[in-house]
């Protein structure tokens, strides 16, 4: 039942975010600048799905995402710094699903558990 609810939430967020979709950026593509943490699991003309594993203590290099739906699969603590912004520490909880606007940032796992995320980028 929980998997069905997560799937329904993802589909609903995709529909809501669809009209605000943007092209996937190329110059700071996480698959190119952070291939050790970002893996492509699916891509078609509508979406690109990335699986992200960030081990404790790892800081990802500056990278960019287009509009996307993010699904957190594990609990972990992050320090996220948007380009030109101040660091923000956040506890990410397993099961959280959110829609995200385009961003250029770097992410540091400041906790003791691996961060596991699915990112559905809208094209």
What are these regions, as identified by a protein language model?
Residues 7-17:
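Hydrophobic membrane-insertion alpha-helices, especially the h-region
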Residues 57-60, 96-108:
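Histidine-centered metal-chelating micro-motifs
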Residues 65-84:
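Glycine- and acidic-residue-biased ligand/ion/polar-headgroup-sensing regions
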Residues 75, 102-123:
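Ligand-binding loop in jelly-roll beta-barrel domains
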Residues 84-102:
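Short acidic-glycine-tyrosine-enriched beta hairpin
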Residues 34-61, 66-70, 120:
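A short glycine-rich, His/Asp/Glu-containing loop-to-beta-strand
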Residues 1-4, 19:
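Positively charged n-region of N-terminal signal peptides that target proteins for export
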Residues 21-29:
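Ser/Thr/Pro/Gly-rich low-complexity linker/stalk segments immediately outside membranes or between
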């Amino acid at each position: 039942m929980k998997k069905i609810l997560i799937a329904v939430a993802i589909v609903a967020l995709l529909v809501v975010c669809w009209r605000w979709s943007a092209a996937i950026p190329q110059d700071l593509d996480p698959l190119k600048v952070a291939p050790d943490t970002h893996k492509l699991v699916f891509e078609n003309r509508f979406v690109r799905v990335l699986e992200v594993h960030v081990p404790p203590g790892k800081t990802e290099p500056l990278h960019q995402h287009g509009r996307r739906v993010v699904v957190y699969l594990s609990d972990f603590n992050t320090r996220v710094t948007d380009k030109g912004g101040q660091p923000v520490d956040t506890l990410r909880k397993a099961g959280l699903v959110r829609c995200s606007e385009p961003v250029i940032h770097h992410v540091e796992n400041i906790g003791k558990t691996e961060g596991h995320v699915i990112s559905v980028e809208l094209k």
